[in-house]
């Protein structure tokens, strides 16, 4: 996947519309986490150094197709003004002749932040006339919002067909890392997949089975696999409609020579509660009336052994109910093992990212993916509309 390089373009004096992902948590009119804003700074600094006139567009929250003050971009404007060493202006409108005038009046290296794009319902509907209005604001289009690349919205896909289009530095890094992971991983390639529901991860498991040497399964989804093999799972979370597919996936792994592992022991509880009674049980299964809440010590040892020998590691999803301290050990131990590995390590998914932060090892991970749903769809092997529209015509 070859993307044209933003660094090689002459952008002096040109108006550049950058689709960013500034969908940050806001409380009492203040942005409480500025990580997503900070991650776009390399792209913004590049554009400032090139003398571009920068127009930023993002969504925030889920407004219902019209202006809602609680979803205003103003708290983002306050943070952005602190973070960049240039003049930042704010437009209360997204489109229209007044906004076009504001874009033309920008000095080189200056920034104009637009109000929430989703205050127009046409944004999510990718309406052609709205795309044309957005295109009037700029001479060049840049998408630096990988987290929204799986959505074919006006600002993520539609407008890219109307202007010269490029990936921002953050977007390009995500695409390069995830593409490389799937195309030419150094072996052994170990994927660790967790989370509560097998239904939300089954497409990834199927795609990864064709590419990995070891597939380690944890979290609530593991109990559907265990049930499919007639292992007692008590009242653990099971999706009966996925039992036969889970059974077949284990069989297919055996035929293809992939080491697919499921938990051999468990930390169980008598209720889904941080104060529940707990026990450790082995592969004979989970007692009636109890539920699996985390992988057990033998499973941790097995998974850590596979991680130690790996050259490439992908981790998506926790090993247990790690937000409850009693059931966080499996997830934290996996995070620590990955951090000690000399392999190329990629971590994605909000819970896994929270786990590496909780374990204090985020700085030892090669790449932490900001993609969320976009990362999942990319790993499933699906085409992302927001990426497809950035490719040179011969690659589309």
UniProtKB/Swiss-Prot annotation:
GO molecular function, one term: ADP binding
Name under which the protein is recorded: Phosphoglycerate kinase
Annotated family: Belongs to the phosphoglycerate kinase family.
Compartments in which it is found: Cytoplasm
A single GO cellular-component term on record: cytosol
Reaction it catalyzes: (2R)-3-phosphoglycerate + ATP = (2R)-3-phospho-glyceroyl phosphate + ADP
Entry's Gene Ontology BP terms: gluconeogenesis; glycolytic process
Keywords linked to the UniProt accession: ATP-binding, Cytoplasm, Glycolysis, Kinase, Nucleotide-binding, Transferase
Assembly behavior: Monomer.
Binding site for ATP: 201, 292, 323, 349-352
InterPro entries named in the record: Phosphoglycerate_kinase, Phosphoglycerate_kinase_CS, Phosphoglycerate_kinase_N, Phosphoglycerate_kinase_sf
Organism: Leptospira biflexa serovar Patoc (strain Patoc 1 / ATCC 23582 / Paris)
Top-rank EC class of the record's enzyme: transferase
Recorded superkingdom: Bacteria
Primary location class: cytoplasm
